[in-house]
Amino acid sequence: MIRKKASPHCLHDVSGSCPHLSILLHSSRRPESAPVPCLLPMEAKIPLLTPHTMGRFHLAHRVVHAPLTRSRCYNNLPQEHVQLYYSQRATNGGLLIAEATGVSETAQGYPNTPGIWTKEQVEAWRTVVDAVHQKGGVFFCQIWHVGRASTNDYQPNGQTPIPCTDKKITPTVLKDGTVEEFSAPRRLREDEIPQIVDDFRIAARNCIEAGFDGVEIHCAFGYLIEQFMKDGVNDRTDKYGGSIANRCRFALEVIQAAIDEIGSDRVGVRLSPYSNCLDCWDSDPDALGLYMIQAMSKLGVLYCSMVEPEVVKVDGKVQIPYKLWHFRKVFAGTFIVAGGYNREEGNRAVSQGYTDLVAYGKWFLANPDLPRRFELNAPLNKYDRSTFYTSDPVIGYTDYPFLSPL
């Protein structure tokens, strides 16, 4: 059996209508598996809850909602349940990054993921953005193109997916025995690449038109931009292949196009140099990451969100590799880390100056009031991995419980 699953990238750090929207905004169904929150004594303000100025944005705390694909945007449109999901997690002065959003028809590769290349999509996102802004949140939209991580079924007119290479992603046997397999791709011609760059530029403009405060360009987890960046995939012999400078050329052209369109103070970038997701790896991730960080600093990129190498547990405790120091020291803008962080490790990372902000995925999807739970040192709801990528507009999406009012 061949099965397509939703994007694994967004939950690494861990990215119809709702008839009862007004009710659900204030009360959510408690999953049977979720613990009843029991508040512990408050303590002095923790590092994660101290303010931070990110360019023009004055953030009240450092707990960031990571971009998380959830496969619930039917027909590539965010609907009322999506509005509810983000508004539940919005806080005054808190930064949320919306799920990976396609820049064009050819950008799609997974079921029920949103886009922002049409007027209808822009208007649909506007209602979501308005709901977040009404609660004082700062809202960025992650924009992407999946490249070879697609099948002909998701491409316009059944055409072949278009990455930097003709190499196909190796089929993967999933835990349930099914197989994840992508279609054989067609290498982009050099003369086609400017159109993809322009798609990102237009998407950035559309995000601002929809009301977003900025965009995060997805240069991570094995999707199109990273496919160009990493030598484990990029086998081109033109100006977009070979040296690090050539392999990063496409990424920097996209970033520059977005900056030219909406300003560097509204552009963030996500990188995962150590990841090998989707057969996308590099022989020298340190050099690759450093090259990108230095170039992004020169361009005045607002923030860089970087993903830790694989996190392990020792005696039940999360062990963060802390391998991003050299990138943090070089980057001139706001630095965001992600990848396995909990409350304790997040506080440690901020207090030691390792990062400015910490992005949370799985814990934020399961705890809509995560900053408050961190403040009170309250127990966290357990996330249900089986509902990460299902299409239900409520279960595993908007029904995770809040803490009881004090």
From Swiss-Prot:
GO biological process, one term: oxylipin biosynthetic process
Residue numbers annotated as active site: 223 (proton donor)
Keywords: Fatty acid biosynthesis, Fatty acid metabolism, Flavoprotein, FMN, Lipid biosynthesis, Lipid metabolism, NADP, Oxidoreductase, Oxylipin biosynthesis
InterPro entries in the cross-refs: Aldolase_TIM (IPR013785), OxRdtase_FMN_N (IPR001155), Oye-like (IPR045247)
Its biological purpose: Putative oxophytodienoate reductase that may be involved in the biosynthesis or metabolism of oxylipin signaling molecules.
Protein name, as recorded: Putative 12-oxophytodienoate reductase 8
Family label: Belongs to the NADH:flavin oxidoreductase/NADH oxidase family.
Binding locations of substrate: 218-221
CDD domains registered for this protein in UniProt: OYE_like_FMN
Organism in which the protein naturally occurs: Oryza sativa subsp. japonica
GO molecular function: FMN binding; oxidoreductase activity
Pfam families, per the entry: Oxidored_FMN
Cofactor(s) listed in the protein's UniProt record: FMN
Organism superkingdom: Eukaryota
EC number annotated for this UniProt entry: 1.3.1.-
Residues noted as binding FMN in the record, renumbered to the chain: 67-69, 100, 142, 270, 340, 361-362
